[in-house]
């Protein structure tokens, strides 16, 4: 939605808030307490979340990720908290000189494709968004038919498949996501910005 450009990046932050079974802020305590590390990232094409755990914590990692997809807490407290976090990230990274350089570069390379916009989105879109819109976004885009789960390391394949089925098998598919992105005309001239 061109009027809600901020949602993908915003969800990268919001889905660390907690779930029905994980208290607010507990994601970030559970993982290091079990020898793991974590992070997330949003690009123009995808958002990814990852945890790295000792292999004997595989089930914990799968449970955490299934909670993020199936039972996230999307409430006004989390939205308000992460609203400020995302705005601060924009000020520190995107409003800095190198961030502005990338903005100008993309605006000159792309005229109609969404790549012309910064992947952090527009803050006025964030401010205008309603709680219901955030809930609808999660329901639309966070389903197994729009996700890839990667498990690597010192694991037993058959056991891992059973654990994946246990934690992800009952997650309902979201709507099919149709991506009708506009085509750019080739750049046939020198662009000076």
Question: PLM features: what roles do these ranges have?
Answer:
Residues 77-84, 92, 96-98, 103-104, ...:
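Non-catalytic accessory/assembly modules
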Residues 18-21, 52-83:
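M16/insulysin-pitrilysin zinc metalloprotease superfamily fold
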Residues 19-20, 54-56, 84, 91, ...:
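Solvent-exposed coil/turn segments that connect beta secondary-structure elements
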Residues 23-57, 93-146, 170-193:
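Non-catalytic beta-strand/loop surface segments
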Residues 9, 49, 65, 86, ...:
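Divalent metal-coordination and catalytic microenvironments
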Residues 1-30:
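Active/ligand-binding-proximal structured segments within catalytic/core domains
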Residues 83, 131-167:
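Non-catalytic, conformational "gating/processing" segments within enzyme and secreted inhibitor domains
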Residues 1, 71, 157-158, 174:
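Short beta-strands and strand-coil junctions in structured, solvent-facing domains, enriched
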